[in-house]
């Protein structure tokens, strides 16, 4: 029984060694064994201890902890994993390790603020050290246990996907505190704003935001609505006069930016970490409902306050939706990237791409393309080639995308303030063009790994957009911070979120059956300043016989109880000799009970509206001198076109027995062609219209099923006749 240890010359007392041998034999009697008869880890640890020739040194252990670990808020390391690092350190230094309990006391000597948490599902929970992270310079560095906190990777470091993925839960972030809010001492307040009122408002608003964050962490999203309503509608009367000041509006914008960033980090710390399906659905629902909750809560408050709240909430909702979709794509892409066979085929197809041709076509999107742009594209191409060749994990691809955006957008935009949006748009244009040409080249050459590249391309596109949207939000927060401190003057610029046009949100007013004059406005993609299309007035002449026109698809339906001519407005696509202004009725969202609210919208007044004839706004075209009248005959928008009381506006068109959209047949310009407003309720009617047309595209023949190995290179996507169909695989 380890009698050889008694012969060591550096023993101080044989009695201590006898006691140790007795304790070891007792531990062996109660050691556990696996089902295959393998000795447990306890015996392995004992063998390591017995092989050690040096006694344990606490100062050396403390020095090792300081060199390899650091304090980091929000990072958890399993207690067993940290102890395994310690055993490895002892083995390499030939020192005798202490047990786990004694090692825990040594850790707290180095990091006194360290806490312990029990995390995991019921029956599988484990103790974790909370607030400590592995340094990037450490040999034990793992992204999962670092400050970056990128993803859950397996402990062995292999590239195969772990069979059991640990699902993230926001409840692990309970107790998270918001960062510091602006201090009233740092603000340049005007004389009309009392400092004590602003200080009180900041304190109240921080408490309100902290309650919202705690509610989100507990996943009780429905309570957020009541918090918003109670805070804004229950505002003390003496605080109402200061809410409309630009200083308070900027303070609210800065605080909302801090809150939304904290919520985003709590719900999804990283897009690479797997989320439960239930949490994903709840996050999407929360992003959809937040705007409606704010409309209700901010009723009757100053317009500039509502505008800044709506703007930031829309950006926040867009980022949440982007994160959920990106998380799904990352989980599907992980399977592709971590497969050695697939990455080898992808590397071979990647090197067969015509890089010179694609680079030239991509540089056409730049007004003043230079040689440095071409070199940068080639450099990025080679970096991606190295990632495929090294069979890097998905975390390396994410780091590469981060560095690419930093080099191409952040550093370029930092040279000139306020140029981030323009630089980001130019980068997105080149990025989209290059990726599209690569996919096209692989399609033409029937690349075997086309499906895998398509999936990776989708994930890369979403992640780049996510990074740019985050940069956009950060720049907006910095603008509000400068405006709040008095460093910037002028009105706050309203910028649009990438990928989502800015839509002006109407202010809700109490609904009253007497006030029936209303209009339903469909927002335009053009500038909100001018409602005129480029074609109003003189039609510019172009070279040649062909002349193209761009007509705005924006229209406004104006209704009035007194008649068709009151407060009517014609928009660019509606032909009329002049434009008349209209006041848009703001549909109620949360009306007061005393105003007759019945729980639903009342569209009864729409049945009394009159017809609105659309006169000609454009004269005869120069190259069609034979036309003396308008291009189209006038038609009327009747109440049957907008059946608001039905479930959907398209329901009458989809039902075979429904009435026509127009009460009477409209005389078309070309009599031999069926009217464009006709609903085709049978294939016979559809073929009758297009039977004699020669300019229709013929149906493409389905690809052979042997062209692609469907599921080998395209996991997570369904194939229909050889074509990939992406969707949420829930």
UniProtKB/Swiss-Prot annotation:
GO terms for biological process: regulation of transcription by RNA polymerase II. This is Regulatory factor X 4. Its main location: nucleus. Belongs to the RFX family. Residues 512-528 have a biased composition (Low complexity). One of its GO terms (cellular component) is nucleus. GO terms for molecular function: DNA-binding transcription factor activity, RNA polymerase II-specific; RNA polymerase II cis-regulatory region sequence-specific DNA binding. Keywords: DNA-binding, Nucleus, Transcription, Transcription regulation. InterPro entries: DNA-bd_RFX, RFX-like, WH-like_DNA-bd_sf, WH_DNA-bd_sf.
